[in-house]
Swiss-Prot record:
Keyword Iron part of the UniProt annotation: yes
Catalytic activity line of the entry: D-mannonate = 2-dehydro-3-deoxy-D-gluconate + H2O
NCBIfam families in the cross-refs: PRK03906.1, uxuA
EC number: 4.2.1.8
Gene field: uxuA
Keywords attached to this entry: Iron, Lyase, Manganese
Enzyme class (EC, first level): lyase
Gene3D superfamilies: Divalent-metal-dependent TIM barrel enzymes
Example GO molecular function: mannonate dehydratase activity
Record family assignment: Belongs to the mannonate dehydratase family.
Species the sequence originates in: Lachnoclostridium phytofermentans (strain ATCC 700394 / DSM 18823 / ISDg)
The name this protein goes by in its record: Mannonate dehydratase
């Protein structure tokens, strides 16, 4: 297992590579290069510079996240051909510089969604990402975008890049005639084009679950349960077509048994990497993100790590969204301290599993 940390790049993150290097048991990054809009080719020179910078800090980078899929691909428009070709060029450029897993999603229009990016936790005074369906129902998509932008502490947020959202109302209208089956059909077309290239290059595509794990604003969503992921993997049978199994995204719905889902897909070698975090259920479709500690949330992190250890022991893991603690100010969900604590906790569980299995 390789324990990693998400990093947004020099000048685009409140955290330095030096700080990440000092986290015990963290071997590298799940990297992000967010200067490109969805549909653009990631230039090889930019990728090379990013990777070299990480290596000089004594860290690895074999996973790249947020290689966003253009909406025209999801909608199945004729213009998708250009954007698919650009995506293929990006895959090849990433593979040339040692990238083995590419994380993306196929969520229409809106990526992950919260109704509050800094809800104060009464028990300790920290704050974390929060979702309440009742609050969401009183807001329009445009209001959600505006609220998210205002609460980002000046940082771009993955899935909420300005260029993706400036035509929000127009794009939402285009999805009125797209149901889940049609979205899957368009997804299959995309996979049939890109997965053979991944096989050729030795790269895995890892699709991230819907977050939260249910439809929003009437948009089709096709990646938020074991059954739906079975359908996704049936679209193209290849070990290069995998899941980025995010425990917090799938775990936002208490009907999802996360250890069972891990064993189901990990046993088939169809998990490319893991985002591991905890959530606290507060009511129907209402939750906040907690520390990684099992007792702080609603997910059993020991059982989650045990399932990973049993079925995907050579995988990549990173702690996912953390609380903002100790007066830290940074990108919501992506501070240093709580995620570093998460790594220490998850590595402790892993060490116990390793030693008890011998």
């Amino acid at each position: 297992m390789k324990m990693t940390f998400r990093w947004y790049g020099e000048g685009n993150d409140s955290i330095t590579l030096k700080q990440i290097k000092q986290i015990p048991g963290c071997s590298g990054l799940m990297g992000v290069i967010d200067q490109y809009a969805a549909g653009e080719v990631w230039e090889e020179s930019v990728i090379a510079e990013y990777v070299e910078h990480v290596h000089k800090a004594g860290l690895e980078v074999e996973v790249i996240e947020s290689v966003n899929v253009h909406e025209d691909i999801k909608l199945g428009l004729p213009s998708r051909e250009l954007y698919i070709e650009n995506y293929i060029k990006t895959i090849r450029n990433l593979a040339k510089h040692g990238i083995k897993v590419i994380v993306y999603n196929f969520m229409p229009v809106l990526d992950w969604l919260r109704t509050d990016l800094a809800r104060v936790i009464e028990e300790d005074g920290s704050n974390s990402l929060y979702y309440d369906e009742e609050e969401l129902l009183g807001l329009t998509p445009l209001q959600i975008v505006e609220n998210t932008s205002k609460s980002s502490n000046g940082f771009t947020l993955p899935g909420w890049e300005p260029e993706r959202l400036k035509e929000l109302e127009n794009v939402l209208a285009l999805y009125k005639n797209i149901d889940p089956d049609k979205l899957r059909e368009n997804y299959k077309y995309f996979l049939e084009k890109v997965i053979p290239v991944c096989e050729e290059c030795g790269v895995k595509m890892a699709v991230h679950p819907d977050d939260p794990a249910w439809p929003i604003f009437g948009l089709p969503r096709i990646a938020h349960s074991e059954e739906l992921f079975d359908k996704i993997l049936e679209l193209y049978d290849s070990e290069s077509h995998t899941i980025c199994l995010c425990t917090g995204s799938l775990g936002s719905n208490p009907e999802n048994n996360i250890p069972e889902i891990i064993r189901h897909f990990g046993g088939k070698n169809r998990v490319g990497c893991f985002h591991v975090r905890n959530v606290k259920y507060l009511g129907y479709r209402k939750f906040r993100e907690s520390s990684h500690l099992s007792s702080d949330g609603s997910l059993d992190m020991f059982e989650i790590m045990k399932a990973i250890h049993e079925t995907a022991p050579d995988t990549y893991i990173r702690p996912d969204h953390g609380r903002m603690i100790w007066d830290e100010v940074g990108r919501p969900g992506y501070g240093l301290y709580d995620r570093a604590l998460g790594i220490a906790y998850l590595n402790g569980i892993w060490e116990a599993l390793e030693k008890s299995s011998k």
